[in-house]
Structures are given as structure tokens and as C-alpha cells.
Amino acid sequence: NLNPGSNTIKFEGYGSGFFKLSGKKIKTPILIFPDRYIAIKSNKKNNIKNEIINYSNEYKIDLIIYGNPLGLESSKDLITKELNSLNIPLEIMNTDAACRTWTVLVSEGRCVCAFIKPQR
């Protein structure tokens, strides 16, 4: 668990093709942790997996959220397989639900990470 505070990353907005975090509009997929985020320029699954492993060496991650426009339809894609291999609980949902779920869980002080692709 982390203490929710002013430095916790929260969504300020999201919509078709973008996220707004910390006053910045981001148009790429993001990997987000309670205290930082990374704009992912391409879907290099090894980079995503390695970043999560590095973070989990620092903090015990309660949950990984995978948000994408296809929701559960993406449950057989390569990213899902890589995330499942980490042996951390994984929830797959559509992008909007992932943004809302992220906001609720970090406000509760939960240590979650999420890989979220913008809606099209």
C-alpha cells in the first residue's frame, strides 16, 4: 500500500485518442504507476514487462490493469500473455473503465500499475 497524496498520478481527463495526466495531454499508450507514468511510443512488450518488474522490486504491486479499446476481446493478445507471466493479478477492461478503476484504487492507497491504450 502507498499513502495517497498530492504526488499520486491521477487522470485529469481522457477521450478519443488521448489521456490528460499532470496537465499534459498524451496521445500514446501509457504505463502508469502511483507516482509516475511512462508514455509508450510503441508496444514493445518487453519494455512494459521490464518496467513493471523494476517497479515491483520497489513496491508490492496489488494489481495490474490492462485497459484497451477492445476490453476483454484482447485477452489473447501478446501483451496479455506477457502481463500474465508476471504472476500479479491482472484485470482486463476497456480504456474508460481502466481510467476510472485506476482513479478509485490509487485514491484508496492501493499499489496498482496499469498499461492503458487510448480509445480510438
Residue ranges and their predicted role:
Residues N1-N50, V106-R120:
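Non-catalytic interface/targeting segments
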Residues I40-K41, L72-S75, T101:
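Short active-site-adjacent helix-start/loop capping segments
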Residues N50-E51, D77, D96:
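Generic alpha-helical secondary structure signal
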Residues Y55-I92:
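Mid-chain, well-packed structural core segment of small domains
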